[in-house]
Amino acid sequence: MSDLTICTHSGSFHADEALACYLLKLLPTYKDSKIIRSRDKSVIEKSTVAVDVGAVYNFEKLRFDHHQSGFTETFDDKHDIKLSSAGLIYKHYGKDIIKQRLDTNDSITELLYQKLYDSMIQELDGVDNGVERYPSDIKPRYQSGSSISARVGHLNQGWNEPQDDEIVNKQFEKAMELMGQYFLDRLDYYGKSWLPCRSIVENALENRKQTHSSGEILILDMFCPWKDHLFSLEQEKDIKTPIKFVLFEDTSGQWRVSAVGINLHSFTLRLPLPEEWRGKRDEELSQISGIEGCVFAHANGFIGGNKTREGALLMAIKTLNQSPKTLLE
C-alpha cells in the first residue's frame, strides 16, 4: 500500500472533487494512494495532494483548491470559466491520462484534450462555480435533475439520514466511480468513435466541389456522427459558404439527405427541404419533386430519403436551386 495520500474536504461532496480524485488515481504515481476526507488544516498539510480543500492553488506543491479569494485560473485564454478542482487536475494531468489510456501521439492527444474539456470538464467547472448556461431571466421550460452533477449530488445522505463519516465516505467512493466511469466512457468514445469520423468528414469537405459546383453539399464515404466535426472543420478551414446538406447511405442501403443546422445544437436549419415536399412519401413525393426514387421528406424539412445516391443528390441540388442565395450565408 502506498504512503501517498490525496486529501479532499469532508461533508457533502460534488462532482468536481469526485472526478479530480478519480483522475489522480488513474496516474501510476497515485493509483494506490489513500483518499482522505477532512477539513483539518494539519491533515491537509500532511497530505501528498490536496484537492478542493485548503484554500491554495500551487501546482508545484500539489495543492489544487479553487475556492480562495483571488483565484482566477481558467483552462486557457480561450475559456473564461474559472476552473473547479476537476478542471485543475485535468488541466495539469489530462494529457498524460489520455496518452496512457489511448496511446495517442501529441497532435491527437491535444485534439482529444481540448474536446473532452469542452464537452465534459467545462460543465463541471461551470456548475461548481455557479455559472449559468444561459441568462437568468430566461425561464426554463422544464426541470433538469439528471445531469451528471445532479446524479452525484443525489449520492449525498439526505438531511434525515445518518451523517456518519464512514457512510458518507462510502457514498463518496460511489461518486468517484460514477464520475470516473463517465469520464472513461467519454474518453473512449472520443478516441475510438468520434476521432475516426473526423477524417471522413474532412475528406468529404475536400471533395465538395466535385460533388456539386456550389460546394454546399457533402457526400460521406460512410455514415458517421458528422455534425460536430463539420462545424469545427468549417471554422478551422475558414469555409466562407456554409455547407447546406450532408448525404450518406443508411443501414438499409438507401440514401439520406440531411439539412445542416445553423449551429451544432440548433434545430433551425441553414436550408430546409422545400415546404411542398415536407410530410410527403414515395410516389407522391417523387411526383411533386420530379425526382425518381423518393422515399420521404420529414415534416420539419430536416431530412429526406431516396432509394439512390443520385436521387438524394438531386433532392439537395433542387433545394439549393429553389433557395435565395442570401439564406444564412
Swiss-Prot record:
Q: Name one Pfam family in it.
A: MYG1_exonuc
Tell me the InterPro entries matching this sequence. Answer: MYG1_exonuclease
Q: What Gene Ontology cellular-component terms does the record carry?
A: cytoplasm; nucleus
| UniProt family annotation | Belongs to the MYG1 family.
State the name under which the record lists this protein.
MYG1 protein
- In its UniProt entry, the species of origin is given as Dictyostelium discoideum
